[in-house]
Amino acid sequence: MATVAASSYPPPLLDAAIALHDGQLHIAEPLLKQYLKRDPFDARAIRMLAELAGRIGRNRDAENLLRRALELAPAFTAARANLALVLYRQNRAPEALAELDELLATEPDHVGHANLKAAALGRLGGFEEAIGLYERVLAAAPHQPKVWMSYGHMLKTVGRQADGVTAYRRAIALQPTLGEAWWSLANLKTMRFEDADIAAMTAARGSLALAEDDALHLDFALGKALEDRGAVDQAFAHYAAGNATRRAQTGYDASVIAARVDASITLLTPAFFAERAGNATRRAQTG
């Protein structure tokens, strides 16, 4: 199976695709697994199962599935694009770039491939090339707030702060609730927000449909803006709210770390190490 036909998806795969689109992973997973029991060589189903694995953070499983799909169908560009994304998510930017270069060789005008390549280059210090790619993407698709924000990150990194601010502002104009763009502005130490900015952030923070990450970044940005104005109590109320959200996300429990440190202090005494002096050397000699 060297290629993948897009027009002949069987009903079980169409149902699984709809479930994936709607975020109903509990429906998509059994459909895909049952289908693959009947036809374990269908690269389309394997790619869809890989996408499901990636959505729940099982990136290694997703990678293995995608490599299998590409063994079966080397020209399956959707699977290769998914593989590049999974590698990028695992901080394996050089490997992601290799896949993206292959994709762009056959689909040179694909803005999604160019956008991901720009992000991967940014992780490797290829800032100028990344900027060029972002400019190409934005010329073709100018209404993408997160791309404008990523472009702003690259501009800021190379010292083009004024251009970076313009890019962040463009992102915010397209999506006023984009918390990371507001925080990126706040994180510029010379930035001072106007009354209109604070009003816009406050309105965005009150949005009922606000994503958790947007909320916490808006809290941090509002905290910085209000602190700069001397409104300390209001500022730290926002800092506290943002940190509470972040702590809930990470599941960090300081008492667990404290207990481990206390146990280590109790166990790892000078006498403990003296009793075991030379153990590593003896093991190396007898190994």
Model-derived segments and spans:
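Alpha-helical solenoid repeat scaffolds of the TPR/TPR-like class and their adjacent stem/linker regions
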Residues: M1-G287
